[in-house]
Amino acid sequence: MSTARFIKCVTVGDGAVGKTCMLISYTSNTFPTDYVPTVFDNFSANVVVDGSTVNLGLWDTAGQEDYNRLRPLSYRGADVFLLAFSLISKASYENIHKKWLPELKHYAPGIPIVLVGTKLDLRDDKQFLKDHPGAASITTAQGEELRKMIGAVRYLECSSKTQQNVKAVFDTAIRVALRPPKAKKKIKPLKTKRSRICFFL
């Protein structure tokens, strides 16, 4: 029996968007009621997706600026990134393009990204939005638009509290890691002897 392939999946995004809650919800089927900044221990377990068994390694990262130097150490060897923003935070949505995409392109170029909108249960919660005037709902269309803009492979929305779509997020990440999209080839001049000869003629 062959050993399961190891897949390293790293969550990235602003602080307090729900990255750690999403990981806890997926691995333990529980939802932490208090905000605790990144206390998720790296997790590894065998998971079956589409008949394939993989050893899924989950890595949590802290979004706060204090961790800007340490965070990229987690990116090494990543097979896929879950790039998360909150569906009730316009700032976290905008930071995907402003902060997180440039960081991932710099430290982990070419690694596929799955874009994830978190806190789905709160997006249509009128009472929550009324009690939090600063909250701004991000629509599915806006999420899909952002996915295209940053070149993410997929876009999903989930709620760690209700567990809606949480498993789908990680199943998608595994599928993407197993079958990464082919990079678009940039057309470069051929560096063959023949092309050099033609060039000088």
Curated annotation (Swiss-Prot):
It holds the Pfam family Ras. GO terms for biological process: small GTPase-mediated signal transduction. Disulfide bonds: none annotated. A lipid is attached at residue 198 (S-geranylgeranyl cysteine). It is a peripheral membrane protein. GO terms for molecular function: GTP binding; GTPase activity. Residues 199-201 form a propeptide. It is found in: Cytoplasm; Membrane. A motif (Effector region) lies at residues 35-43. Expressed exclusively in the root, hypocotyl and stem. The modification Cysteine methyl ester is found at residue 198. GO terms for cellular component: cytoplasm; plasma membrane. Gene3D superfamilies: P-loop containing nucleotide triphosphate hydrolases. Keywords: Cytoplasm, GTP-binding, Lipoprotein, Membrane, Methylation, Nucleotide-binding, Prenylation. Inactive GDP-bound Rho GTPases reside in the cytosol, are found in a complex with Rho GDP-dissociation inhibitors (Rho GDIs), and are released from the GDI protein in order to translocate to membranes upon activation. Belongs to the small GTPase superfamily. Rho family. This is Rac-like GTP-binding protein ARAC2. The lineage of its organism: Eukaryota, Viridiplantae, Streptophyta, Embryophyta, Tracheophyta.
